[in-house]
From Swiss-Prot:
Protein name (record): Cytidylate kinase
GO function terms (MF aspect): ATP binding; CMP kinase activity; dCMP kinase activity
Catalytic activities: CMP + ATP = CDP + ADP; dCMP + ATP = dCDP + ADP
Species: Klebsiella pneumoniae (strain 342)
Binding site for ATP: 12-20
InterPro entries: Cytidylate_kin (IPR003136), Cytidylate_kinase_dom (IPR011994), P-loop_NTPase (IPR027417)
Subcellular location: Cytoplasm
Length: 227
């Protein structure tokens, strides 16, 4: 039964460091990895590719139900494949991120993608990265972590990432977009962004990634009694 397969959920807002933490934990434990945020981004990108209105739940549901998405882990990086095409870079644009937050707010869209996310639960275990992994998708997960950081710190991190890729970034605009997205995610009617009652809340604002990984792995191993 899949219920016997352990899951570590890592929830939190964008820019808190969830992706880096999940890859490090998956590598350390030798577990599978699910980037649930990527699924919503892939759906948003598919909608943009197929000219489907990202604000129309009716139009998005059939697209979500037949979404052709795969995750391929290669040399420590996660390749996201949509309809046979590597879209790992394309789904990380701010346009797609904003669209993903909109499509994720629709109840029927979330339901259409729920089964697909749960299907990633395979032995020896799963690291699930998202916003409602511990509250909705895997409520029975034995280890739940909510990774947070201030909006200002997350905006600075995102700005550095984009600048390293050669993009010209306006910090105030980026901060405003992050705050708007936070407000939308935390206050939506369906699966709002909140820590699970039994989650460890880990604030990464003043921590470097190595410290975050160390704290998260220590907590997970204590909960799972994994050597």
């Amino acid at each position: 039964m899949t219920a016997n397969i352990p899951v570590i959920t890592i929830d939190g807002p964008g820019g808190a460091g969830k992706g880096t933490l999940c890859k490090a934990m998956a590598e350390a434990l030798g577990w599978h990895l699910l980037d649930s945020g990527a699924i919503y981004r892939v759906l948003a990108l598919a909608a943009l590719h197929h000219h489907v209105d990202v604000e129309s739940e009716e139009a998005l549901v059939p697209l979500a139900a037949h979404l052709d998405v795969r995750f391929i882990s290669t040399d420590g990086t996660l390749e996201v494949v949509l309809e046979g095409e590597d879209v790992s870079g394309e789904i990380r644009t701010q346009e797609v991120a904003n669209a993903a937050s909109k499509v994720a707010a629709f109840p029927r869209v979330r339901e259409a993608l729920l089964r697909r996310q749960r299907a990633f639960r395979e032995l020896p275990g799963l690291i699930a990265d998202g916003r409602d992994m511990g509250t909705v998708v895997f409520p029975d997960a034995p280890v739940k972590i909510f990774l947070d950081a201030s909006a200002d710190e997350r905006a600075h991190r995102r700005m550095r990432q984009l600048q390293e890729k050669g993009f010209d970034v306006n910090f105030e605009r980026l901060l405003s977009e992050i705050k708007e997205r936070d407000d939308r995610d935390r206050n939506r009617a369906v699966a709002p962004l909140v820590p699970a009652a039994d989650a460890l809340v880990l604030d990464s604002t003043e921590l470097n990634i190595e410290q975050v990984i160390e704290k998260a792995l220590q907590y997970a191993r204590e909960k799972l009694a994994v050597a």
